[in-house]
Regions:
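Generic structural signal of hydrophobic/aromatic residues within well-ordered alpha-helices
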Residues: 31-35, 44-48, 64-69, 84-88, ...
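Enriched - but not universal
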Residues: 156, 174, 225, 235, ...
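Eukaryote-biased recognition of C-terminal alpha-helical segments
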Residues: 35, 39, 241-316
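Post-BTB helical module
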Residues: 1-84, 94, 98-99, 103-109, ...
Length: 316
């Protein structure tokens, strides 16, 4: 009103009032919109300082994100670490698709942190399998769990931003890590297998899109470890959703060529018979493979089927 009637003192008084009081987020949008609409001179600048970004912020944004994420990965207080993980996850996932000015964490920053965590995890496993008696075993085991959890968190962010395809390839290539993993007691290492489960869930839901060669490669490298750790995974944490993992693993297997499905599922069949509930129950995938292979066969050259099944006759 003061602006409309050219009452300058009234305008100044209103601006001083707005500058001195807190705003809710809704009020913030109203203030910005109002001042832009009225096109008041530089006197409005002071009011908007609390929401105005410095031009250099855009250039430094990725450094800020890197420092924040690194701080969480290295935090000493577990409770504070969990709270800040949840906070940053929520902020990074906020839907602001209509805001073209949004500054977001870069793919390079996230993958830099992934590589750093994998290197730390590799070092922890090397120390855990070593013979140096001077090392604090309890601290090493704690670090293994922590680094695995760190990777899960970064991968979750990557999946949310549809940037995780490259990580599947990286994880599939961790042959040395998988070898060391097999030498560490299950109770200490099962958090690592949750990374594999996380990727299978993402692939199974169609959130991670990678070529079939990479899908098979990640299973070739890590599926045995997931089988071995599955019992501990579901017993050690209420956060582990058995059905979610089994469905994700099933769908991932069923995206492979039929011969690879056969190889994976026949191996699972034998293991499940011996391990029972300590092995993922993916019999739905087995049923679908069975029907594809023997009932609803599709082949350009049916007479040249390459499927090979070996059956043993047991005496009755």
């Amino acid at each position: 009103v003061s602006a409309a009637i050219m009452f300058d003192l009234g305008v100044v008084s209103c601006l001083e009032y707005l500058e001195s009081i807190p705003w809710t987020e809704d009020e913030q949008e109203e203030v910005i919109s109002l001042l832009e609409h009225l096109q008041i001179d530089d006197s409005a600048t002071e009011v908007l300082l609390r929401v105005s970004s410095d031009p250099s912020t855009a250039d430094r944004a990725d450094d800020i994100f890197l420092n924040l994420l690194s701080g969480i990965l290295q935090a000493k207080d577990d409770k504070a670490r969990r709270e800040m993980k949840a906070l940053l996850s929520r902020l990074l996932k906020e839907d602001v698709s209509n805001d073209s000015s949004r500054l977001d964490v870069s793919k390079d920053t996230l993958y830099h942190l992934c590589h750093k965590c994998i290197s730390s995890l590799l070092l922890c496993l090397s120390e855990a399998t070593g013979s140096d008696e001077k090392l604090d075993r309890g601290a090493i085991i704690s670090n293994i769990t922590r680094e695995a959890d760190n990777i899960q968190w970064i991968v979750d962010i990557l999946i949310g931003k549809k940037m995780s395809d490259e990580f599947v390839k990286i994880w599939a290539e961790q042959k040395e890590l998988a070898t060391l993993h097999s030498k560490v007691p299950t109770v200490y290492r099962h958090e690592i297998s949750r990374i594999t489960a996380q990727l299978c869930i993402g692939i199974g839901r169609g959130h991670i899109l990678v070529p079939k060669e990479i899908r098979f490669s990640v299973l070739s490298t890590w599926l045995e470890a997931l089988y071995e750790d599955f019992g501990w995974m579901r017993r050690a944490s209420r956060a582990v959703d058995r059905k979610l993992i089994e469905d994700g693993l099933s769908q991932t297997i069923l995206t492979l060529p039929l011969l690879q499905q056969q190889s994976v599922l026949l191996n699972w069949f034998d293991r499940f018979l011996n391990k029972g509930d300590d092995c993922p129950n993916i019999q739905k995938a087995f049923e679908i493979w069975w029907r594809r292979a023997f009932i609803r066969q599709y082949s350009a050259e049916p007479e040249n089927s390459q499927l090979q099944i070996t059956l043993s006759d047991y005496p009755s």
